[in-house]
Amino acid sequence: MFSGSNSYLGGNTGRQPPQQPQQQYGGFQPNQGFQPQQTGFQPQQTGFQPQPTGYGNAAPLQPNFTGYPLQPQPTGYSQPSQAGFPGGQQQQQQFNNAPQQQNFQTGAPPIPQIPQQFQQPQQTQQAQPPPAPPVQQPQATGFAAMADSFKPAAAEPSKPRGRRASKGGAKIPSIRLSFITAQDQAKFETLFKSAVGDGQTLSGEKSRDLLLRSKLDGNSLSQIWTLADTTRSGQLHFPEFALAMYLCNLKLVGKQLPSVLPDVIKNEVSSMVDIINFAIDDDAPAATNAPSFDGRQNTATPPTIQQPQPMASNSALLTAQMTGYPGQQNNFSGGFQPQQTGFQGQMQTGFSGQQGGLQPQPTGYNQMSNPQATGYNGPRPPMPPMPSNFSSHLSPAQTGMQGGMIAPLNSQPTGVDGQWGLVNAPAPNIDLLHSRMMPQQGREQGNFTTAGITGNAEIPWGITKDEKTRYDSVFKAWDGFGKGYISGDVAIEVFGQSGLPKPDLERVWTLADHGNKGKLNMDEFAVAMHLIYRKLNGYPLPAQLPPALIPPSTRNFNDSIGAVKSLLHQESNFRKNSGATLLPQKTGVSYLKNHSFRGDATPGRTGRKDATVYKNNDDDVGYKSSARRRLGASSPRPSSPGSTTSNDDLSLDQLRKKIAERQVILDAIDFKAENAADEDDALDRKDRREAEDLYHRIRRIQEDIDAHPDASLRNVDSGAERRALKRQLQTLTDKLPDIASRVRRTERSIADAKLELFRLKDAKAHPGSASSIVGTGPGGAITESDRLKARAKAMMQQRSAALTGKKIEASNDDLDAPKRLEEENLKIRTEKENNERMVQDVEESVRDFSRGLEDSLKDGGESSSSEHEKRRWEDGLGVEDEVKDFIFDLQRSSRSARVRTDDRSRETPRTEASHASPAPAARSETPSSQPSSTPTPAGGSYSQYKTPEDRAAYIKQQAEKRMAERLAALGIKAPSKSGETTQQRLEREKNERAAKLRQAEEEDAKREAERQARIAEEQGAPPPAPEQPKETAKKPPPPPSRKAARSDASERKAEEERIINEQKAQIIATNELEDDAQRQEAELAKEREAAQARVKALEDQMKAGKLKKEEEKKKRKALQAETKQQEARLAAQRAEIEAAQARERELQRQLEAIDDSDSSDDDEGPEQVTPQASTPTQGSQELERKEPSPPPPPPSIPVVVSPVPAIATTTSLPSPTPQVTSPVVSPPVDTETRNPFLKKMAQSGDASTASTASNNPFHRLPAQELSTPAPIQVQPTGNRPSRVRPEEDDWDVVGSDKEDDSSDDEGPGAGGARHLASILFGTMAPPRPLSSMGNEATSAPESPAVASPPAATPPPPPVPNFNAPPPPPMPSAGAPGGPPPPPPPPPGMGAPPPPPMPPMGGAPAPPAGVRPAGLLGEIQMGRSLKKTQTKDKSSAAVAGRVLD
């Protein structure tokens, strides 16, 4: 709101003519010191023509009352004039209700009296702040009536013109404000329209009345007004009014008002205010007494002037000025300064960059200080400048002083065609369009509409800088690969999001794709987006692209191409016309006038050669080729330092001399070449030797790696293993908070239970004390309400006692009970806090440990260089063919060794279990099994620690130990312990190194034994004899320790039981962690196997196309054929010695029968004195398949039979527990077997199921079975009758594991699917008699031995010499009374029954339904049974059968 108003000019002619206010744009400082100027001798017939009051970019101006408030009068003439530059916006002041002023005879309009506030002497040079004017009406600022301004005034206003017709009332754009909701905005619009009426702004008084309804205090309303009035005009546009309502709501809900508006809200409000001001239509001017200039009027069609855009939103209003007095302006930046009118030489308004104030100019004669009469008949006032032409550019006209200093001006784009990216008009809905056109999900459906992005804003042809920035961001978002263009298919998707119909999008593409390239660059994409933007705001698409939208790149590119074409055309014509087409290479003369295509004929540049002339200058180079000059001897050879004359001038002697010299040189060259060749050969031989040596060393290292105990770990993908370990570590770490919370809950429960127990005990000890009060407070505390209840209860008891006559003993302990309870509560709380600190310490230590593990896993990650080296030296990528073949050969040998290791590892668990099965006494003497069975002496047991701190430290120590062991097994170094001293760490590392050294020595010994056995097998001879003492010396230590262990067996047993009982708490605490770790290890093993399978498949694929593979296949086939032939020869040899071994077998059976009868009543478990290393044979019935293990602690009497000439046997008796074992018989000392059944079974083993596989082509040879007594292996690696020895081991080990400590029978460890099946199906049916086997005979059948044994057994009948099926498996320990079902016998084989097993003295009585022992005795005596013809071989080897 303006603080002052201008007065109307009065009716006396002695006063100054009116002064039109003129805006001085861009400044806030008032121009002081303007003196009233004289009007000169101008005839004032029709008044003064109004002059331009602003610049082309001026914001819309508001009307100002410049006279008395009660009778508004026009200050000049409402016909605006042309400012003289394109895009200039004229200001117009009109009042439809202004009455016509009378024309006096003087020709000048009557001047009203000067208001009181302006009656000052004219000599006053100081500016006065004008008072506040009355309510002002909005001023139209369009260009519709610009051309009509030069015509005679009409009697009534013309109708509005422009793109949209004028409507009554406030014009509010359809733009959503983001800081209020749509419903609130609709309500505010209704309220604003009802309050503003036909105007566009809400005055300060009305705004005050509306804001006072909010009941807010004056300070808040003042702050709200300051924030809302963004234009500082004293009036509110609709967005400002909505902002004021929004701020009032913030204050009403209790929020603080912001000191400064946020940029988003401020920009939205300012932009909408500018749009409202620019959208105001121009109305027709009111009738005035302006003179008619018909004679000088330009009748041509006025040009179409581009709508200018505002530079700032706060320069929208005029500053009211006194028209007749200088200095009547305020400090508002958008105000106009008073300017004298009527002088021809006015200032030019179409340029920028000048500074300084406007100097008032006289309108008549210069320096006239006295007012002049208005009736002077001189020249008329100058007509306002008209446009000089109506082309695309308008000529500026002079409107002020030539060369005068003006206020700083900002250069504004005029909107003329060809201007690119310089328009600064507000861009409504551009944010919505930008967000719509960006890549978004769901765009594949294509269901886009124009809802939400359409509008009716006025948009110029030119693209604004803000729009160009947004279009470029959309382009870059879709051009993900940075190609610099967008193809047609992408453009369909982008432009389709606008919702425009397909024909419009086709026209947009046609207009934007300059040159029909099928793709759009960044500028062309901006053009297309701008066309879409205009179309969404109601503008039609043009038929052709206007010059304003032609991208500079396209325009400049076409111009540059045209310039180059023109240059080439001109140069070609010049050469053709001037004869310059002659070859300058021959003439050496350039026929061009200039040495440059640019036509720069500078005399100083004539010596410089360029592309116009080319002539090679041989002097500029250091080498000259004379070969081309020697052809035909047309020119002499150029001189050289070594030859001054030609060969023709030399004499014969000279020529001979030169030939001899050349011959000497050639001989020297040949000699040097021979020496070099010899040296190269020597170097090649040396390199070959070194390479062979390296190959050999690499092979040895690879063999050592394959034979290492941790060789299986290196085949695992380290990355996958590391990720699996990280996942396992994360899983365990995630469980820590839950475990800690459960511990804390348990501690709280314990504390509550202890407190409750104390209350009960205290109440029992002091029946009448106050401790009987039950506390209901937190933690069982007694509250005041509990005491009141107790007192009321006591009073009731006293009253009831008084009524009944009973006596109530008064308690004196009322004060002591709370004290005792408080002491106990404090004690319990202290203990609870101590436990909580311990739990926190454990949590922190576990977290530190997990962080250390995670860091170690991260540090061991593979880099790109290591990955490259791995692919090069393991996959053979990027190396020579010879090296690649060597790598593949190493991999093949490594896989073979790994398969052999896997075969041995399958038997290792059972062997270790056989060592771990004896009593604790024997276990304590075994170094290998001692760590797993007895606790570490340094660690102690869980029960040894009495305090919670010690127990927590013990649990932590054990957990760290187990984790370190697992990490060591995986090949990861465990992080150092924070609480471990240097001495302890050195001691621990020393022990670890010693253990690893012992293990490595044992593994080396095993590998050496296997290698010797393998060599012996390949040579077809039995193993060397010196190995037997070695193995014997290796195995026997357990038996000698038997007596020493038996001496303190009871003590160790008691200690073991006590330790087991004490470790229950620790087992409970760590059981869950170990189960999870085992599960993770199982998953890791599966992943490792999968990775190995993938690697193996990849290797097989790489080798598939190799020629060497075919050669290897041929060699393998030949080797297999040779193996089969050798097996055939060995089978024939075995058949020849079968007869010689029959007698040996009979003597062996008799000896076993005698041994069994002698030891039938002994309770001692099976014992084997002779080590397994001396019993390598496996085919006979009498051989025991298990490793020697420490004897049990109970006293046992082993029956050692004196050796016969060919056999030394040791029979072990079964224990009284229901365990079925078989006797053990040692073979001859010389380890050479002559058992024909062993060889028969080796031949028939092809039809049986092999427990392990082997890659050895000689696996069927008996020599291998004879010479592979691995120290920890139970079975040889070759094929053999697989249903004899594993099942015997299974029976023994299960029995020894499952029975009590009193039954300490030996037996190797067993496991696997067959063992489990024998346990499951061994007891499902009653025992089957041996008659189901038919009349077959087997070389080594295992008798079930479940019937009551006789005192002695007769010698077995002779056994026919033919191949027989393998024996049935031994029953498991879980089924003591039932024998396993026999395997299906082959058809057509009738033979006496097999010899029986020695009787088991301690076997229990058979269960009900079992056949009597007499039948078994008859069968053992040789009774013939019915022949069977069963041919079904599909059942499993250990499948059960249902008997009738």
Swiss-Prot record:
Bias (Pro residues) ranges: 1351-1409
Feature: compositional bias, Acidic residues: 1153-1166, 1287-1307
Domain EH: 184-272, 467-556
Record key words, sorted: Actin-binding, Cell membrane, Coiled coil, Cytoplasm, Cytoskeleton, Endocytosis, Endosome, Membrane, Repeat
Biased composition (Polar residues): 1169-1181, 1245-1257
Domain of life: Eukaryota
Repeat in keyword set: yes
Domain EF-hand: 216-251, 500-535
Positions in coiled-coil regions: 685-763, 980-1157
Biased composition (Basic and acidic residues): 607-622, 806-875, 899-913, 947-965, 985-1017, 1045-1061, 1076-1113, 1135-1149
Intracellular or extracellular location(s): Cell membrane; Endosome membrane; Cytoplasm, Cytoskeleton, Actin patch
Positions of the WH2 domain: 1411-1428
Pfam family for this entry, one: EH
Single Gene Ontology MF annotation: calcium ion binding
A Gene Ontology cellular-component term: plasma membrane
GO terms, biological process: endocytosis; endosomal transport
Residue ranges of the region described as Disordered: 1-140, 289-309, 594-651, 797-1444
Protein family according to the UniProt entry: Belongs to the PAN1 family.
Chain's role: Component of the PAN1 actin cytoskeleton-regulatory complex required for the internalization of endosomes during actin-coupled endocytosis. The complex links the site of endocytosis to the cell membrane-associated actin cytoskeleton. Mediates uptake of external molecules and vacuolar degradation of plasma membrane proteins. Plays a role in the proper organization of the cell membrane-associated actin cytoskeleton and promotes its destabilization.
Oligomer status and interactors: Component of the PAN1 actin cytoskeleton-regulatory complex.
Name listed for the protein in its UniProt record: Actin cytoskeleton-regulatory complex protein pan1
Name of the encoding gene: pan1
